[in-house]
């Protein structure tokens, strides 16, 4: 392994690797909507929840805000996810733009000398958060709102999140974070897919519990075994 690393150029890493800096919680109420002039950055992962959020924002929210649908490519995605994003873009009638990490998952793990853990999910920061912030910083955005398709029912950590939050971006400015489907049930997620004639990512039919960055090393062991049985090349 050390010989391999000597032969490889180190990945280009940003200087600031810490989690994004927090400022006081947003003073918005849970039911508040973005101001009409704010631009919505709709984070789209290829999963059912972010797709449900995108459908709701595009067709059912009634919001007049400019919307940018953005997929952050971690370099560790299943081909079915790319195919689903093409179908989703057609359904939305809207281009899904892409932000990309500067290095892939394995390069990051080699640089760190370890894999991420439940207590140190640096993969999320380095492969999702910072690339999205860099994408936002490269655009001429007017008071952006980052829309995240997460639900409280997914995990204990997410159950402690708030609908509105704000954070300091790596590009130097604060921006709002909005989680409009935080209180939705999984039944509501699948219902909006059905209303808009959109089949969820086919990975769910193969037993995947989560599909972004696939296979995620944080999924259940049984799900990993199932993924490796279906695709031995993953090993």
Describe each region flagged by the PLM.
Residues 1-235:
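Nucleotide-activated chemistry modules centered on ATP-dependent adenylation/adenylyltransferase
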């Amino acid at each position: 392994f050390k010989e391999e690393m000597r032969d490889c150029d180190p990945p280009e890493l940003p200087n600031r690797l810490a989690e994004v800096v927090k400022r006081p919680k947003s003073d918005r109420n849970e039911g508040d909507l973005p101001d009409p002039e704010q631009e919505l950055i709709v984070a789209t992962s290829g999963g059912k929840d972010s797709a449900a959020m995108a459908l709701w924002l595009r067709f059912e929210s009634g919001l007049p805000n400019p919307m940018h649908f953005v997929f952050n490519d971690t370099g560790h995605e299943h081909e079915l996810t790319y195919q689903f994003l093409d179908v989703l873009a057609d359904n939305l009638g809207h281009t899904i733009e892409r932000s990309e990490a500067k290095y892939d998952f394995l390069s990051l793990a080699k640089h760190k000398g370890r894999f991420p853990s439940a207590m140190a999910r640096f993969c999320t920061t380095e492969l999702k958060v910072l690339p999205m912030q860099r994408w936002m910083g490269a655009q001429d955005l007017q008071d952006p709102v980052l829309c995240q398709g997460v639900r409280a029912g997914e995990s204990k950590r997410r159950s402690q999140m708030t609908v509105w939050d704000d954070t300091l971006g790596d590009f130097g400015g604060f921006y709002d974070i909005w989680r409009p489907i935080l209180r939705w049930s999984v039944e509501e997620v699948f219902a909006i897919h059905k209303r808009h004639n959109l089949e969820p990512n086919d990975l769910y039919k193969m037993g995947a519990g989560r599909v972004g960055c696939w296979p995620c090393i944080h999924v259940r062991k049984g799900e990993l075994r199932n993924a490796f049985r279906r695709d031995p090349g993953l090993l």
